[in-house]
Amino acid sequence: DLDVTYTDGSLAISADVCNLDKKVAKGYKLEYTLYANELYSDENVKVENVLVSTAVDVVNPGQIQTTKAVLNVKAPRKWSAEFPYRYTLVAELKNAKGKVVETTSTIVGFRKVEIKDTPAEEDEFGLAGCYYYINGKTVKLKGVNRHESNPAVGHAITRDMMEKEVMLMKRANINHVRNSHYPDDPYWYFLCNKYGLYLEDEANIESHEYYYGAASLSHPVEWKKAHVARVMEMVHANINNPSIVIWSLGNEAGPGENFVAAYDALKQVDKSRPVQYERNNDIVDMGSNQYPSIGWTRGAVKGDYDIKYPFHISEYAHSMGNACGNLVDYWEAIESTNFFCGGAIWDWVDQSMYNYDKKTGKRYLAYGGDFGDTPNDGQFVMNGIVFGDLEPKPQYYEVKKVYQHIGVKAVDVR
């Protein structure tokens, strides 16, 4: 976290110490040190005069003891998509004799995500409202939805493939990814932390067949624990990643009370990030919808719908076929106000698979029944702005142009 001036940082640490021995564990302590990583590098140096030690209470055999500590850091280098400065936190568990019995580490970053009311005189557009901030500044999340998919390996993406994806995104001015619709491989978060991509991490909940009707699994109490468990598994696994700036409760899984329980459980663990759940805006911190028309988006900018929170379009500009031609119309509206903090195109990469022509043996990107499979999704899996093998489509270059961070306008040209 950062202080109110976004200058000094504090790191709230919670650690579980488990006694796997048959004897009572006494006199143990945890010591924490911090190392500053070079920008875009895994090389780091120790941060001097930043050290905290906390005693571990007696731990009985087979039991877990939770310890908490706060590490204060003067003027840390802040993490953002533009300057993703990271730190490595090292924890050492020492016994009563001072001997190190276990060491672990994790990547962290100092940044502050806020949703706050803003008076007109403090807004660059002169409009009062409730806006989304990172490190004290409004941001535009220029995003895509991403499935883990590659025609060579299916869903088992390699590290080289993920690295190529990140580089392609950065070159296209993409600064945001919605992990749709499940938490991703740990290495994906590592790369987004390192190179700077704002993530919306999404719980693996999508009872799409029942959608928002009375039969939705979000209603029956029998499914409450499952909803809460999937959300909390995501949070506990990924909470340390500075790249995660939004939590999502799931996708297209209904409006019921089970998501209220999941939201409440999440907030017990992490209040530092806002929570979104597409369309079901009454129970979360920020608004969202899917595939709004350009007319609706322009109307929202004008205040036609009396929406009280910052808005993030979780899916828009469905990139099937010859699509994305009107992307600039969305962004002219989005960039005219801080009411919209951005959105995520559906989607990043085609979900195709390699197949081979029976006559020529030539390999091609197959989909929608090309394997003789029935039923199939037709071309509905081919919505990316890049092909399955990560070759950019024309849409990629359209996105790069519209998502550019600098606008240029001719003035008095002769």
Model-derived features: positions:
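Substrate-binding/catalytic cleft of secreted carbohydrate-active enzymes
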Residues: 121, 166-169, 176-385
